[in-house]
Amino acid sequence: MRKQEIDYLLTQMLDSHDNISDLNITVGKPLQVESAGRLLPVETSPAFPQLTPFQTEVFALNLIGHDRRLTEHLVSHGSCDLSYELPGKARFRVNVFSQR
């Protein structure tokens, strides 16, 4: 997946429901949003009915970009925090966690 495809999926997630507070990208789950305190699956094109570990990792690495410091922190600590922007649409606070 390329950044352009990630941005397209994030846009679909944002447009899927009203009052979205969180976007969730979790192994073994579909893409989900939190709306009014409820987790709701998001139908996207292409569909992601159940994210694989590989798909989730690719998604996270695209959000991290080429930031070596964040990548090293993720590897050494199992998590990293960053911000990500969809120009003209939204800015996100991102928390990436890895399972060992």
Regions found by a protein language model. Name each.
Residues 1-100:
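N-terminal "pre-motor" subdomain/linker immediately upstream of P-loop NTPase catalytic cores
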